[in-house]
């Protein structure tokens, strides 16, 4: 079911128009938000992706990452940073900044 919802919204195809989940008509009490909720494995993959981005871009301020996530990664990085991964990412950025000052 989760794969079908992702397919219908074109979430995994960068070449197709992205539909909003709020516009999806559902039947039988299906909870789209619950189906699209990130698993622990998904969250760890996204955190890894953010850390790689931080290193590649030389990010030394949390605000820079939040601004990027809000503008370009609103559906995956932004909620993760707002809900439960900000601490580990902030500490990673802070340690990078401290390391580069030495």
Curated annotation (Swiss-Prot):
Species for this entry: Staphylococcus aureus
MF annotations from Gene Ontology: DNA binding; DNA topoisomerase activity
Homology family: Belongs to the Gram-positive plasmids replication protein type 2 family.
Protein name: Uncharacterized 12.4 kDa protein
Record field: transmembrane: none
Pfam families per UniProt: Rep_OBD (PF01719), RepB_C (PF21861)
GO cellular component: extrachromosomal circular DNA
One GO BP: DNA replication
InterPro entries with a match to the protein in the record: Plasmid_rep_OBD, RepB_C
Keywords of the record: Plasmid
Domain of life: Bacteria
